């Protein structure tokens, strides 16, 4: 066997693949030619030394309490303002209200994030329904820390529709 073939067999044996060897080379080194494993890429160590990646060091804050509490009254005023401005003159239409729910949710979420409340996860739930002499009862249950987590909600009504909006602020430790 030539030196080139021996070197190729040695490299392939080192990588765990013999599938690319010719049948006479396989017989010469005593392996079967029915090898299944192949290697399509192998990173050689030492070739990427010239590429320098900046190291970013992050330190733990060890903060377990918020520096600023969730502003319930500010968020309630924000909900009142957004719901009134978007729904004051609207009549209930199924498709319009479906799209309006998504739009109002995104607007409320963006405005609450603009308050820059650090380390709080913001969850916004908006429900819009038609007023037709019916009763509705809505509720929510949460597993959270009473000392740090909170919520704010507002109910809006006009002649043809109602909207219930709730914003949950959950502290992220």
From Swiss-Prot:
It comes from the Eukaryota. One of its GO terms (biological process) is microtubule-based movement. It holds the Pfam family Tctex-1. GO terms for cellular component: cytoplasm; cytoplasmic dynein complex. One of its GO terms (molecular function) is dynein intermediate chain binding. Belongs to the dynein light chain Tctex-type family. This is Dynein light chain Tctex-type 5. It comes from Danio rerio (Zebrafish). The lineage of its organism: Eukaryota, Metazoa, Chordata, Craniata, Vertebrata.
């Amino acid at each position: 066997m030539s030196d080139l073939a021996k070197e190729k067999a040695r490299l392939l044996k080192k990588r765990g693949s013999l599938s690319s060897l010719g049948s006479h080379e396989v017989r010469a080194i005593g392996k079967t030619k029915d090898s299944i494993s192949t290697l399509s890429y192998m990173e050689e160590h030492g070739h990427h030394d010239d590429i320098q990646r900046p190291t970013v060091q992050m330190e733990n804050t060890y903060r377990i309490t918020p520096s600023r509490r969730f502003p319930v009254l500010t968020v309630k005023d924000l909900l009142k303002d957004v719901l009134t401005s978007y729904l004051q003159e609207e009549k209930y239409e199924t498709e319009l209200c479906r799209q309006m729910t998504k739009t109002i949710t995104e607007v409320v979420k963006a405005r609450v994030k603009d308050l820059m409340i650090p380390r709080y996860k913001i969850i916004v739930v908006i429900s819009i329904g038609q007023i037709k002499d019916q009763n509705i009862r809505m509720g929510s249950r949460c597993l959270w820390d009473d000392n740090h987590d909170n919520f704010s909600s507002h109910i809006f009504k006009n002649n043809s529709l109602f909207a219930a909006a709730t914003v949950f602020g959950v502290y992220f430790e």
